[in-house]
Amino acid sequence: MPQSSRYSDQRVEQLLSELVNVLESQHAPTDLSLMVLGNMVTNLINTSVAPTQRSMIARSFADALQASIREDKAH
């Protein structure tokens, strides 16, 4: 079931496009991009989420990420 969001699809897509543009302009390979994005998520959780909620938020994020990965062989 799709998750509802308080943010518009347009806002999400615009931010995603800007982040992708930064990574592409830096010619960042996939492994570096994943490392940087992972560090960004960690930083956001550690600086913006109450300590008592961090583990739950990280687990929820990881579960959502895993659920969004396609299992087809194309990439």
From Swiss-Prot:
Q: Which domain of life is it from?
A: Bacteria
Which InterPro entries does this chain map to? UPF0352, YejL_sf
Extract the Pfam families matched here.
Answer: DUF1414
Q: Give the protein family.
A: Belongs to the UPF0352 family.
Q: What is this protein called?
A: UPF0352 protein NT01EI_2610
User: Which lineage?
Assistant: Bacteria, Pseudomonadati, Pseudomonadota, Gammaproteobacteria, Enterobacterales
